[in-house]
Amino acid sequence: MVQQIDAPLREDVRLLGNLLGETLKQHAGQELFNQIEQIRALAKGARDGQAEAEKQLEQLFLELPDEELLPLTRAFSHFLNFANIAEQYHVVRSRRQAEFDPDANSPNPLVHLFKKFKDKNISTEKLFQQICDLKIELVLTAHPTEVSRRTLIQKYDDINACLSQLDQQKLTPRERQNALANLKQQISSAWQTDEIRQHRPTPVDEAKWGFATIEQTLWNAVPKFIRELNELVQDNCQQNLPLHIAPVRFASWMGGDRDGNPNVTHQITQEVLWLSRWQAADLYLRDIENLRWELSIQSCSEEMVEAIGSPHPEPYREYLRATRERLKATRHWLAQRLQGLEADDSNVIKSKDELLQPLLLCYRSLIDSNLPEIANGQLLDFIYRVNCFGIELLKLDIRQESGRHRQAISAITEYLGLGNFESWTEQARQNFLIQELQSKRPLLPKYINEPEGSLIGHPDVQEVFATMRTLADQPPESLGAYIISMAEYPSDVLAVLLLQKEAGIQHPLRVVPLFETLKDLDGAATTMNTLFNMHWYKQHIQGKHEVMIGYSDSAKDAGFMSANWAQYRAQEELTAIARKHGVQLTLFHGRGGSISRGGAPTQQALFSQPPGSISGAIRVTEQGEMIRFKFGLEGIAMQNLEIYTAATLEATLLPPPEPKAEWRELMNRMTDHSVKVYRQTVRENPHFVKYLRTVTPELELQMLPLGSRPAKRKVSGGIESLRAIPWVFAWTQIRLMLPAWLGTGAAINEVIADQQKATLDEMLQQWPYFQTLIDMLEMVLSKADANIALYYESHLTEDEDLKVLGNQLRQRLKDAVETLLTLKDESKLLSDNEVLDQSMQVRKPYLLPLHLLQAELMKRRRDYLAERQAEHTPVDHALMVSIAGIAAGLRNT
């Protein structure tokens, strides 16, 4: 039987389901509604183990005409999205309810952490200083797994607001009736809206979604979060946080990530940079209008009078008039540039300090005038926002693949008659690059580097030069890091520095190598040691460096366990090398939502990093759909800001213990075995690629307009050419979840069979890293379903070789589950995580029909294509809806 979920959540799920049912009856007819209810009843029976119910369900879908598949698919997809809405709102409701109950545990992890610090005798001075020094940066990326349209997301937010209104205790009957009517209207509107985009979003569209997240939730959540943090600091450290505090900041890859995305050009990057500054100016302009309205008071300091030039009846309004006009001028100038027009920039705000200084003067004046309650109102929120978001709203990272930079340098060396840079030894490359970086003369004549100078190189190379020229024209504060994907050698870093020098970038972007494959992770520390040993480079970095750890590609390359351990070791080695050279290292974690892309609950994920690797500073990507789940609602955004802050503080001040030598030895042994098993299947089995493309919707995923990036790095090729994210997504759709467990279960089982379980038990009890690894494995295994995977296979192929492989994979999945249960001494998965277990049980009756429908839709579509028929719109549309619905139902897998 299904365990009972919290009553308020259950009521919300039921309410949304009932209103969806009423909407279906009204707009799609009683017959469809009856059919959906029949399917739901059969799916519940199948969930509870009734084999006959599942057979009836399968037969029903086989007999349905094409045109009836779409409304059925949409109905079940909508319900899963509504379940997500109800769960997200329940998190916000639970936080609020806890504040009413003095005996309840605080939902803020910082409250518990401060108590822990006190128990562990962390001094208040040390704690205060560490909070002031925090540097957490969350980097928003638009990876193609956010399948929901922005239009629908807005409607989901409106539904959430309706649930909040209905939760109010003192609604009159009429108010409640109106709230229900509004909720039904939103659900009806969602049903009447196409959930699938007609066109792929452009990189500019993606960037605008990032700006919308800031405007709709984080703009208010950030100052509220800092206020709460300050209250805790006052209570525990008896001090106030400084005005310049910004423990969490935000950056973006949207419009800057050109790795494998030909749609991100230098023109697009320039447009996004201008748009970002325009959005910031627009938001600040609204704030300053509100602030001037509030600051009608007369009392002010001598400093304020001097700044105005003479006494004034409304000094603050008068003083802020100039800042308001500058914000208007800034917004106007950016609007003109976005339209391709020139404009006067003499009054444009070009740095954060230009905006901040007038606000700080107002703050000092109010404090001097004995008006702290006004100083600490809207004005303080404004100051917090400027410190967090700057004049750029989101700093833009630039990312490009290392090979492009090598090609660009090669084009230069060949033009100069020096030969092909790419064919040189690594030492020769380093010598040349360092020599040119130290030289005061340019490497090329100036006209070669002009926009019209297309004298050297392939168009791809010219685009690298054009991007560098674009970066040279930006205010330094608008830009973040320059990420080199697929970084392998020290010369990869030096090449980007030389290209920046040649473009005349006065304030070079910090260059961040991204180590992604197993081989590159293993060599990361050696690469950085070589760089730190270079006198010129050591002077250039001025004691600070950032390195990015890739999760997605390493897991696709070696499997989850081997990649995870390689990432851990790389971080340990990088931390040690940086310490040896006196360099302050910031690790940038390229995590996603799925566990094979580094996904894990934030607090667990950060606390399980190697001791010393998080020293008050961290960067983390927030990818695709996770942005909405973590920051789509103000209350949830607040919670995630608290979690990131608590996790970073704890990992810094109370780092986990060093793993014992025997634990390391066992991990090395397990990962060696794991990668062999993984690669034997993925690389060496001749039928594997065909199985992936036949049984999963990998090919169909390419037709879904998910993101601006192509699903493949190259048009042709096998697994190695497939991007890591569609690779994970395809296996998730059929519930095999293969990237997350293949090889891992076999490796653990081998160790248990060798009488090593006692050591594993010790690791599970005492080592946060291993605890997190096993917890994540259990979570993903709980969402896997071998029977559903078998249904796809039996429905989509008659190939005996593929069936043999499928049997092997499902047996490995079964073995992995049994191994995990043995390791944890449990009889069922998620015994210690009832919340997730209940959530999945509620979703099963809606997920099962979507899977069966999807398999049938894939078969019909392929049959039509085999018969050379044109695209079959009802089938294509329904298939895309099924992909979106399953993604919504499974969320972070």
Can you annotate each of these PLM segments?
Residues V2-I5, R14-G17, T23-K25, E54-H78, ...:
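Acidic, glycine-enriched catalytic cores built around paired aspartates
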